[in-house]
Amino acid sequence: MTAETETGIPGVPGTQAADQFNELPAHVWPRNAVRQEDGVVTVAGVPLPDLAEEYGTPLFVVDEDDFRARCRDMASAFGGPDRVHYASKAFLSKTVARWVDEEGLSLDIASENELGIALAADFPGERITAHGNNKDASFLRACVRNNLGHVVLDSAQELELLDYIAAGEGKVQPVLIRVKPGIEAHTHEFIATSHEDQKFGFSLASGAAFDAARAAVNAENLELVGLHCHVGSQVFDAQGFSLAAERVLELYSRIHDELGVTLAELDLGGGYGIAYTAAEEPLNVVEVAHDLLTAVGKTAAELGIEAPTVLVEPGRAIAGPSTVTVYEVGTIKDVDVDDETTRRYISVDGGMSDNIRPALYGAEYDARVVSRFTEGETTNTRVVGSHCESGDILINEATYPSDIHTGDLLALAATGAYCYAMSSRYNAFARPAVVSVRAGAAKLMLRRETLDDILSLEV
């Protein structure tokens, strides 16, 4: 039998592949994740099996120092914490809002309840930006009353409504206009947000963006301070960011020439790709920031306008790599796929209710046993959840050690973004707990839901 047929990994014998399975790729796992001599994985000095025993599984474990370090990395790359707005849609709690505040970053939110969470954490309204394509009067009124630093306008209807609400409150609301520069991001269709045929923003090509800018400039209770664009999420082609900036700056020039207004800010959103598996490489944010800021300065000079301050909105790139989800292995079965192929199905005690991304986007993850070393030969494996849904798959195709057994703790890395945030109660599953770890100590951020929580909504 060749090494390739043993493992599915060309040139890698089974035992060597098992050794690789014991490794924790540094570009995927939290910075403070370590496999100890007994095979147990710790994060920030806290053994994951101890956390699983205390808080149950599934369990989200957040490396606080990793999260904070990524905030500082972004601030350093883009010229200061005031230039960086953490995209709270990735994952938000009062604790996270406090971390972001303490690191000096701003915050972007996309619903009235996200705003409520931020305010409950005493996050300053002046450092909050409100997003959304369908903000209602209640949401907009809350933005104005809490003195939000920016409201990102997404439609002519919203522009008129916000002007009316601000007038009623006796205030002038700073706004950005979301622009579609027509860039096709190299990402999944559902997370590409800058092409023409989608729900967000005003078209640059059709002239709708300029019309919106003119309306905002003429509105008595709005202050147009800049433009916003976002090419997509989990983007690895860095050229798209610079190209989008160049196209949007042409609108800055037109606004300056025809409306006599110099816009001070350019918000280029986020979308910086991270590694979910060992085979992937995260986008180098330092290089992207350098290229982006250089492109903005160069293009502004060519257009004869003052270069605006560049703002960015990373979410996944901060929250994603800081977190792992710990599951307990349950049922294991071998399924004959055809006459020559057998696939091992490993079921865990969570699934699409705590991580919908594989089902929704075809997202790929990698897993590791974190309660011990694995030593077995490898086998074709699929990791699935416990839900009554054939698409409840966490890892579709993998080659994992054959000695994984019921009761093992299996962890998926890079689950800090869009996992808990998009969680559900499908099959009446209770949402998992979220625990932060730092310097050998754990702190409960969000408790595990109970049946009583689910029943509390009944009337």
Swiss-Prot record:
Requisite cofactors: pyridoxal 5'-phosphate
One Pfam family from the record: Orn_DAP_Arg_deC
Residue positions of the active site: C388
Modified-residue entries (N6-(pyridoxal phosphate)lysine), positions: K89
Gene Ontology terms, MF aspect: diaminopimelate decarboxylase activity; pyridoxal phosphate binding
Keyword Cell wall biogenesis/degradation: no
Catalysed reactions, as listed in the record: meso-2,6-diaminopimelate + H(+) = L-lysine + CO2
UniProt: substrate binding residues: R316, R357, Y361, E389, Y418
Protein name per the record: Diaminopimelate decarboxylase
